From Swiss-Prot:
Broad enzyme group: ligase
Gene Ontology BP term (one): cell wall organization
Keyword tRNA processing: no
Protein name: UDP-N-acetylmuramyl-tripeptide synthetase
UniProt organism field: Shewanella oneidensis (strain ATCC 700550 / JCM 31522 / CIP 106686 / LMG 19005 / NCIMB 14063 / MR-1)
Domain of life from the UniProt record: Bacteria
Amino acid sequence: MMLLRELLAPWFPYAGEQTFLDLTLDSRAIRRGDVFLALPGHKVDGRQFIDKALAQGATAVLVHTDNPQEQGKVIVAEQGVQIYFYELAKHVSAVAAVRYPVIQGHAMGIVGITGTNGKTSTSQLCAQLVTLLSGKAAVMGTLGNGLWGELVDSGNTTADAITLMRQLHEFANKGVNTCAMEVSSHGLVQGRVDAVPFDVAVFTNLTRDHLDYHGDMENYAAAKQMLFRFDSLRHGLLNLDDPIGGAWLAELKNVPAKIWGFSIEAHKAAAFYTKNVRFNDQGVQATLVWPEGEIDISSPLLGAFNLSNLLAALSALYLQGMDMRALAAKVPYLVPVAGRMERFTTADNITLVVDYAHTPDAIEQALNALRRHCAGVLWCVFGCGGDRDKGKRPLMGQAAEQFADRIMVTSDNARSEDPNQIITDIIQGLTHPERALTEVDRVAAIKQVVAQAKSGDVILLAGKGHETYQEAAGVRHDYDERALARQLSEQS
């Protein structure tokens, strides 16, 4: 419990003596004794639900106002109190941090990871490594939030500001040593992480995605860069193999954090890098170099991009104070992240690889990685999401056609759009559309490719990854591509 006046004290005085339990942005989730934050939203205005919130037992409602003269205005009603808060939408994270404090410098360090691709893998690798060293790790991101191995589906890459601060507070109370958090561009722009005391930030890469929201690549990049300007930040890690990372190295010279570079291509400005890289059927071997020395590592993860993700995770944990040699010793015991370059092999020696790749760059990276492990034909089965950036559809087709031997274009969360039209949009990017296979039913498409494949072939199933649904006509249908791949591998 907390006094309402203590919650509001950083912004304005309040004389009431009410206590409350939790904060919430969802009027449907209110329990007696909670405080409801009524904000204007992207689709719905929460201020429409003030009466409902009070009727359900809310102690108080904090009401967003754009009028500075209304700051601290109080309306007392029989069911509860309404308190006006100037530009509350901009302060939700800070308000949540008062109720659910996470104190920087205590036992838990927070690693924030941003970038178009690699956020999930890097965060999961951080958590695995901490756990392998007998620490306690938590993850927040696409695969869910929670202690490592106990993730609960979150719905968004970056949770809302209140959920986020409440969970960080709980993690700290549970003795978590490291929380690895995926930080989306949406989460940064919308202020959901404003009060999070990040101590290490990681940038993985930047390629075309979410332009339906950000408008152009410049705005998208600026959103990502916000993470490296937090006052709490002690260290920033930039992928210097990405041109944006190199540019940011110069742009971020005057931020509070110390900025470091990492590279799997031995970039001359990188403090953390790999050399003597050797890929094989079992993964990759390399020499890891960091400011205090070098050591050989052997990773079971496929592809150069996973080596980059691993290097990012190792470097971030080292900057948090962990011993690099101890970390490197645990690398052979890492397991692939669910739905990220996850392999299933049939009795006929056909390899199906389930991956979340859903951008042109991710398709290219995944196919390039698999080419090293493919003795036969390299296939790519993919689609594009509906109600999203239409401009990337032909680019997805271009990437698949250029880096795979055979392609099958199918559905991938058409949402409210016609899946056949999305397939047509993708095919516009092909140089030789007559060579592409198309099948709107994703299961049928995959089965058709498996039936045509031969021993030594590799089939990339791109786009779904860990997801357990296929969304069409606004309805989410149960669909688990990992389970399908496992079933097909066991049937052969």
